[in-house]
């Protein structure tokens, strides 16, 4: 496969297993899903190991120092500096949006039901 034909490598971070499974099932035909995690520590380790092109990142993730997605982003940068982070959340709180954008997320998608 040529470099131009290489599929984008994606990781999914969310503490809800069913949501992760749905996102992964939807993306797998089009992207290489290289990892998934449910908490801060597991996410940082997975990102350091897999170095994905893109991380789809929940804002509210347990563990760590209670920093959630912003903490994952900050801690992962040293291990995977070229990874693009896109936050996904049901929260439209300005504090939540601001925390991950300030930490370096490239975008924020609000999942309203």
Mark where each language-model region is.
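Non-catalytic signal-transmission and effector/linker regions of two-component phosphorelay proteins
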Residues: 1-9
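Two-component/phosphorelay signaling modules centered on CheY-like receiver
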Residues: 17-35
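Acidic, metal-coordinating helix/loop segments flanking the phosphotransfer/catalytic sites
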Residues: 38-54
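Short amphipathic alpha-helix used as the core "switch/output" element in two-component signaling
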Residues: 45, 66-82
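Active-site residues of response regulator receiver
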Residues: 58-60, 89
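A short, hydrophobic beta-strand element within the central beta-sheet of small alpha/beta folds
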Residues: 82-92
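Conserved small/polar residues in nucleotide/adenosyl-binding loops
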Residues: 113
């Amino acid at each position: 496969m040529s470099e131009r034909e290489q599929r984008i490598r994606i990781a999914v971070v969310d503490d809800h297993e069913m949501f992760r499974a749905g996102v992964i099932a939807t993306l797998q035909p089009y992207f290489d899903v290289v990892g998934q995690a449910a908490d801060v520590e597991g996410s940082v380790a997975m990102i350091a190991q897999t170095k994905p092109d893109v991380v789809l990142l929940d804002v509210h993730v347990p563990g760590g120092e209670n920093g959630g997605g912003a903490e994952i982003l900050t801690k992962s940068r040293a291990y995977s500096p070229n990874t693009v982070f896109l936050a996904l959340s049901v929260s439209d709180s300005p504090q939540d949006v601001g925390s991950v954008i300030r930490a370096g997320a490239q975008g924020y998608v609000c999942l309203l039901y």
